Amino acid sequence: MRQMWNGWLLALQLFTVIPIRRSIEWNDIHVRWLVRSMPLAGAAIGALAAGTYALCSMFSFGTPLFLALFLLWLGIWLAGGLHADGWMDVSDAFFSYRDAKRRQQIMSDSRVGAFAVLSLACLLSFRWLFLYETIKAEIPPALFVAIPLLSRSGAAWLLSVGKLAKSTGMAASVREYISWRDAVWALVLAFLALSLLLVFGGVPVWTSAALAVAMALLALGAKPWVEKQFGGVTGDVLGALIEGGETLLWGVVWLLHSSAMG
């Protein structure tokens, strides 16, 4: 139990700005539980966003326009901008139309290109639109937990089973300690957490099923694509999957509500 707890704290230290004032040893069991806890780290970010949304709704504070923008940036800030940076690096690399080796070098470059800026603006514009429309429809706060939970589940799976692009970097430093079994653990924990949201959070069964299927299809499709385009998985690729996954899932929520109302 202590090792599980340490892995969870390590996931929060690595993937969020939540202050964890504790030094945790980087070893095999802690890293395995870090990967297994990735969905729960997403759920922690989502819980803070859900609490903010619930309080604002309870006290009628802010318009849907304001809440959509505020909650959009709150999620990015709570993740430390780490995944947004990955999205930008992957965009720059992909739109260079170079070979996989050169794309890896571009992702390692700290400079920001035009395609990085344009793609991030496109990503966040659509996410803001989906948030705005769904907040107007008075969605349950638990959806703010479910979506980052599922996006990190896909990333944990890809990190555990995907081919590595290189032998250095964040993904490689984690991968040496883990296997496909850790992806199974992460998915089981995500399923249990999602089940709790179904029972206690008011998330409809069909909505949960649609979100889970959409994220599974995205992750399954991402694996061969990133191996072809970038030579494999990197930390930036995982960040891009998380950010792209969240926008996709909010789009699914928007489509479901639009269909129900239309």
Curated annotation (Swiss-Prot):
Cofactor dependence: Mg(2+)
Pfam families: CobS
EC number: 2.7.8.26
Keyword set includes Chloroplast: no
Keyword Magnesium in annotation: yes
Keywords carried by this UniProt record: Cell membrane, Cobalamin biosynthesis, Magnesium, Membrane, Transferase, Transmembrane, Transmembrane helix
Cross-referenced InterPro entries: CobS
Pathway: Cofactor biosynthesis; adenosylcobalamin biosynthesis; adenosylcobalamin from cob(II)yrinate a,c-diamide: step 7/7
Top-level division of the source organism's lineage: Bacteria
Span of the signal peptide: none
An individual GO BP term: cobalamin biosynthetic process
EC class name: transferase
Catalyzed reactions: alpha-ribazole + adenosylcob(III)inamide-GDP = adenosylcob(III)alamin + GMP + H(+); alpha-ribazole 5'-phosphate + adenosylcob(III)inamide-GDP = adenosylcob(III)alamin 5'-phosphate + GMP + H(+)
Function text: Joins adenosylcobinamide-GDP and alpha-ribazole to generate adenosylcobalamin (Ado-cobalamin). Also synthesizes adenosylcobalamin 5'-phosphate from adenosylcobinamide-GDP and alpha-ribazole 5'-phosphate.
PANTHER family reported in the protein's UniProt record: ADENOSYLCOBINAMIDE-GDP RIBAZOLETRANSFERASE
Family that this chain belongs to: Belongs to the CobS family.
Designated name of the protein: Adenosylcobinamide-GDP ribazoletransferase
Origin organism lineage: Bacteria, Bacillati, Bacillota, Bacilli, Bacillales
Gene for this chain: cobS
